[in-house]
């Protein structure tokens, strides 16, 4: 789905979604529910598996290795930052001086698994974690992040720091095994290097081979030329938009 900013691309997809309630998987930024405690590890539901390994190795309760439970730094309550509300200004975030941003209490950091504490493990990048955990069952989930070009993310990285394109790819990673579904993505290549765009296109092709249909709002010519069908709206934005300028294959557009 192509067109200048404000031409009606998102509105078209919202209308389409409303016509098929419950049948469309939206991977647009505004549809991804996150908060300050959301991380790639929690979003992909692998944090519990990591905590279980630490708990088993140290013979203590699994809750000790959660910054949302007993393992939380008492000063920042596991947020890693202190948020100061300013009466007439935006809130100010500062790194917690007690845990130095690790989110965990000092007591919890004494426990180790394979020579590293929970904070050190959760600070690993996705690629590092794949090597560290090797044959663990959840490594397959980590590999999905590599497949969408996010191997550089840290397991404990707050998802509030990610770009819109990165957020979409994290959610996309959790849906790679879906079959026969309809997906809507909004500029998923935003901020990506050309090599990463090519990797993402291979992933899209794999998803369509699995019987999925992808509607992609996109400006990238690399994505458009590989599409099966292009719909372009315009000619301008706002009141000047909303008209169908083209509908057909990339070859027909040329």
Predicted segments — roles?
Residues 1-254:
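Conserved phosphate-binding elements of NTP-dependent enzyme cores
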